[in-house]
């Protein structure tokens, strides 16, 4: 299994240049590039060609653009914006040889029937599939374990991916989001493992279902999630994708970027290596 870094872990105490430097130094195989802030910030003073050259001359490679945000149940103007943004992402993915784009469902206070959520998600993801196909890019739907997210459990997300029925549409399995809204472990046991494109590794303080927020995340193995159970199921089912550590904890933003990146690796390796062989270079 290969190790990936998600830039949310140093959201407030680093930038793409530093993240790449310290991830390369600490033996990460991949990075998920944040398209809403870290990439635009980088492009103020650098070019995509410079970024491409970095990846060509170093071990670390880009795994995903993270993320196409709030893609479903939008009005006509919002829908057009999403499609335009996604087409731009395809050009970035092509330039940097990035295999995945993460797609995040709408978060809203509005009550929307699950049937309407599914219909919209299936329609948009099917269109994204068509757009992505010539680029060889896959789209990974990331359900968010929060009551206000329109797709907030593994089972709901898996049903949507199944309904789309395209090889280039799958899931992000985030351990925090799985735990946070009480996703059913039996749904994971029954899932087609080829539909899980990316594994997000994290842990959390022990708050009740429905009360957890991203800020409650802690280093893998330092919280309340039964990570061993999830990892053993993934191992048994033959998961072969990357594991990407993703934390949003404010107190970790007080650390130096290098310390956070090293600790994220060490804690992830400690948890994951009980079940998978990690191929990190350092």
From Swiss-Prot:
Which SUPFAM superfamilies is this protein grouped with? Xylose isomerase-like
Query: This chain belongs to which protein, by name?
Result: Inosose isomerase
**Does the entry feature the keyword Metal-binding, yes or no?**
yes
- Please give the family membership noted in the entry: Belongs to the IolI family.
Q: Which residues bind a divalent metal cation?
A: 142, 174, 200, 246
Enzyme Commission number: 5.3.99.11
Pathway assignment reads:
Polyol metabolism; myo-inositol degradation into acetyl-CoA
Any one GO MF annotation of this record: metal ion binding
Q: Which key words tag this protein in UniProt?
A: Isomerase, Metal-binding
Q: Which reaction does it catalyse?
A: scyllo-inosose = scyllo-inosine
Specify the taxonomic lineage. Bacteria, Bacillati, Bacillota, Bacilli, Bacillales
Pfam families, alphabetized: AP_endonuc_2 (PF01261)
**Residues making up the signal peptide according to the UniProt record:** none
Matching InterPro entries: IolE/XylAMocC-like, Xyl_isomerase-like_sf, Xyl_isomerase-like_TIM-brl
Cofactor binding note from Swiss-Prot or TrEMBL: Binds 1 divalent metal cation per subunit.
The record's section on Gene3D superfamilies has: Divalent-metal-dependent TIM barrel enzymes (3.20.20.150)
The task this protein performs is described as: Involved in the reversible interconverion of 2-keto-myo-inositol (2KMI, inosose or 2,4,6/3,5-pentahydroxycyclohexanone) to 1-keto-D-chiro-inositol (1KDCI or 2,3,5/4,6-pentahydroxycyclohexanone).
Cofactor entry:
a divalent metal cation
Q: State the encoding gene.
A: iolI
């Amino acid at each position: 299994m290969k190790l990936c870094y998600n830039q949310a872990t140093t959201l407030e105490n680093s930038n793409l240049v530093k993240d790449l430097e310290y991830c390369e130094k600490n033996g990460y195989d991949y990075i998920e590039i944040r398209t809403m802030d870290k990439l635009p910030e980088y492009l103020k003073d650098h070019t995509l060609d410079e970024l491409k050259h970095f990846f060509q001359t170093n071990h670390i490679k880009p795994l995903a653009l993270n993320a196409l945000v709030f893609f479903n149940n939008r009005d006509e103007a919002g829908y057009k914006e999403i499609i335009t943004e996604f087409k731009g992402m395809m050009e970035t993915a092509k330039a940097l040889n990035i295999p995945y784009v993460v797609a995040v469902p709408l978060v809203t206070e509005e009550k929307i029937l699950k049937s309407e959520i599914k219909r919209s998600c299936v329609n948009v993801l099917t269109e994204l599939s068509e757009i992505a196909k010539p680029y060889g890019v896959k789209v990974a739907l990331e359900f968010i374990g929060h009551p206000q997210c329109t797709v907030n459990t593994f089972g709901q997300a898996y049903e949507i991916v199944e309904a789309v029925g395209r090889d280039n549409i799958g899931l992000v399995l985030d351990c925090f989001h799985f735990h946070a809204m009480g996703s059913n472990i039996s749904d994971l046991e029954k899932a087609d493992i080829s539909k899980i494109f990316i594994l997000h590794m994290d842990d959390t303080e022990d708050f009740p279902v429905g009360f957890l927020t991203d800020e409650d995340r802690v280093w893998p193995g330092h919280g309340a999630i039964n990570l061993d159970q999830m990892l053993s199921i993934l191992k048994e089912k033959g998961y072969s994708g990357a594991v990407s550590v993703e934390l949003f904890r404010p107190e970790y933003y007080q650390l130096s970027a290098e310390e956070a990146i090293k600790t994220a690796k060490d804690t992830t390796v400690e948890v994951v290596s009980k079940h998978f062989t990690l191929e990190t270079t350092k």
